[in-house]
Regions:
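Extracytoplasmic cell-surface/polysaccharide-interacting catalytic and binding patches
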Residues: 1-175
Length: 175
């Protein structure tokens, strides 16, 4: 598993064999996502829909240029930008295996970070179910010191089912 974070920089060789698939989300935006990540997402999405929760991908793969644009936008308007967005070259989104979710709630799609933070009950269910499809919550609540980022309930990382279950079991052992 490739780790990209504030200490581990991305390079193009990391994705030379990655197959990105095209997907049009609820806004008809073109999203690119790594093939296995997308397949797992579609299964998670279908399972959650049965439980009354509708999710979609707000953001997937990001080029260095796209990440730079997002980073500069945060830099201009948020004093805590370094705890909310990765610098270009240090984002898991460069791998295509991380997705940011939008959630349909009370008749509308929610994608703003502030509003998503208030969706406590839907995210409890999403976080419980995602493990079974190979996703982990990369920036959990209470782990800001370790991750270097604020809690981001919408940011999922696909690691495969074996690894997601091992991570879940390891967390449970340490409680």
């Amino acid at each position: 598993m490739i780790i990209i974070n504030k200490a581990n920089i991305f390079n193009e060789d990391m994705i030379k064999d990655v197959e990105l698939v095209e997907y049009f989300n609820y806004k008809e935006d073109l999203i690119l996502v790594e093939r296995d990540t997308f397949s797992a997402f579609k299964m998670l999405q279908a399972n959650l829909k049965i439980k009354g929760i509708n999710i979609d991908i707000e953001s997937g793969y990001r080029s260095l240029e796209k990440q730079e644009s997002i980073f500069l936008d945060y830099y201009r308007k948020d004093k805590d930008y370094l705890n909310k967005v990765a610098m270009p070259g240090f984002s898991e989104h460069h791998l295509g295996t991380s997705i940011d979710l939008a959630v349909f709630d009370k008749g509308k799609w929610i994608s703003s970070k502030e509003e998503l933070l208030n969706l406590i009950e839907p995210f409890k269910i999403i976080h419980k179910e995602m493990i079974n499809y190979g996703f982990i919550l990369r920036y959990p609540k209470g782990k800001e010191e370790e991750t270097g980022y604020f809690y981001m309930p919408w940011h999922l990382r696909y690691v495969g089912i074996d690894i997601s279950l091992k991570i879940r079991d390891s967390i449970l052992e340490n409680i």
